Amino acid sequence: MAQDTNNLIWLDMEMTGLNPDQDRIIEVAMIVTDSNLNVLAESPVLVIHQPDAILDGMDDWNKNTHGKSGLIEKVKNSTVSEAEAEQLLLEFMMQHVPERATPMCGNTIHQDRRFMARWMPKLEAYFHYRNLDVSTLKELCKRWRPEIAKGVVKRGKHEALADILESIEEMRYYREHFLKV
């Protein structure tokens, strides 16, 4: 597939916590859509190995959530480093968008960007500096059209690929019902 400046790269990461200075990325995936939110391609879901010392430092919410999903065990068994994941995702992006053409797309995407800037800086630099954040529409809709906001159903699996697909679905919902495009 050729690069297209109108393509959007959607991203989600699972992390060991919320602080990029002490916590680490443990799972990441990307989806490419066209400007109409049609899915064009999915990256592999990359589970990133982290040492036990990092995993042991997770708070109860993260231990419980990532333990139930099986992600902690996958992280322990993974041989993929952050640097390898960064390179694979960079190569994936290069197939679909030119450098600095796509905003970083997702839900509360600034948090993913913070971790990416800390642990995958080359990948972060390939994105445009803008974000396309579904959570902005969510917050506006809750305040301006709460009856529409109630129509959004969140499954909250906290798995990278599932969360991206849910974000795209949520954006489609806001486009149709809130923005009416």
UniProtKB/Swiss-Prot annotation:
Domain (Exonuclease): residue spans on this chain: 8-171
Annotated EC: 3.1.15.-
A Pfam match: RNase_T
Subcellular location: Cytoplasm
Source organism superkingdom: Bacteria
GO-annotated biological processes: DNA metabolic process
Annotated active site: 129
Enzyme class: hydrolase
GO CC terms, sorted: cytoplasm
GO molecular function, one term: nucleic acid binding
SMART domains: EXOIII
Keywords, alphabetical: Cytoplasm, Exonuclease, Hydrolase, Nuclease
Family indicated by similarity: Belongs to the oligoribonuclease family.
Function as written in the Swiss-Prot or TrEMBL entry: 3'-to-5' exoribonuclease specific for small oligoribonucleotides.
Protein name as it appears in the record: Oligoribonuclease
